[in-house]
Amino acid sequence: YEVMKELNIPLVPYWAFKETSPLGLSEWIKVAGMFIGKEEEACQLFAQMEQRYNLLKAKVSNVKQRPSVFSGEMRRDTWYVPGGQSFYARLFADAGADYFMKDNPETGGVLMDFETVYAQGYNAGYWRVMNGYKGEFSYEALKASNPQYADFRAFKEKKVIYCNLEWIPLY
């Protein structure tokens, strides 16, 4: 930061990662728009996203049976999951799902051991995995990374929702 200060380059904090709602996170597009001289376009784009999001959210708001979902995966000896008050938890709820960590008070990531996730997520209907996998991702690749993954109901029923960050610029 010192070099940037010496060159009189202003630093602007980017706090999007602190957002606890998907729309709050998406609204940061307005800040990006300001920096590149496209504030009006960014505001229009956000308004469209907000309208579509709220329309889809309303469609599932009265759903009685909500599919269960768990999230994350093991990295070394730790399973990383979004906290129960994170924007991912809100996204799952707004999409009509019952997130396995919904009662957790954390807004960021939570570190868990395999046994705890297994006990809570074993029978979940869906499993969300997001990582940067080189190559073509498959159930076999997921199983190869940890053979115990094949025991989860969502794996057995082929209901893993996968986002490859190598292909999709989510962040």
Named regions from a protein language model:
Residues 70-74, 114, 124-135, 139:
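Loop/turn-rich, solvent-exposed surfaces of beta-rich toroidal or solenoidal domains
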